[in-house]
A protein has these predicted regions:
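Acetyl-CoA-dependent GNAT
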Residues: 4-62, 66
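Short loop/turn motifs at secondary-structure junctions
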Residues: 59, 89-91, 111
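A short, internal acetyl-CoA/4′-phosphopantetheine-binding micro-motif in the GNAT/acyltransferase core
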Residues: 63-71, 98
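Short glycine/proline-centered loop/turn elements that form peptide/ligand docking sites
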Residues: 65, 79, 100-103, 120-126
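Conserved acetyl-CoA pyrophosphate-binding loop and the N-cap/start of the following alpha-helix
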Residues: 69, 73-81
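Short alpha-helical functional segments enriched in proximate histidine and acidic residues
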Residues: 85, 106
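Conserved GNAT acetyl-CoA-binding A-motif
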Residues: 86-99
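Conserved catalytic-core motifs of GNAT/GCN5-like acyltransferases
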Residues: 94-96, 108, 113-127
Length: 127
């Protein structure tokens, strides 16, 4: 298993990114300003994008695992790497996600705590 930072041609991972953020125009808002990491294990298994939101805060904008690789530990491994990588660089890492129970359970299992809900976020920002 290898995790590497992607410096260029980030759109080559668009199909994987679209699994976690279904609207390309939304991905376009953060893909270039964010840092992208890919987890490889005999092929690309997962991808993540993290942005600097200022004031010592970064946001995990997207983390996606190839469907055939779900529940094999790739998402947790990539998230664990990111938490270590950004520790000391930021005082807070936030995640905005949909309200599906499995997504929330994943983040809580990885040490995140629920903060708040933004009412109508998806209806206001997505087509």
């Amino acid at each position: 298993m290898n995790i590497r930072k992607i410096e260029s041609d980030k759109k080559q991972f668009l199909d994987l990114l679209l699994l976690a953020d279904e609207q390309e125009s939304m991905i376009d808002r953060y893909i270039d300003r964010g840092e992208m990491f890919v987890l490889d294990d005999n092929g690309t298994k997962a991808v993540a994008v993290v942005t600097d939101e200022g004031n010592g805060c970064c946001e995990l904008k997207n983390i996606a695992v190839a469907p055939e690789c779900h529940r094999q530990g790739y998402g947790k491994a990539l998230l664990s790497f990111l938490l270590s990588y950004y520790k000391g660089k930021f005082r807070q890492i936030i995640v905005g996600t949909g309200e599906t129970p499995q997504h929330r359970a994943f983040y809580e299992h990885c040490g995140f705590t629920f903060s708040h809900r933004i009412e109508g976020f998806f209806t206001r920002h997505y087509d």
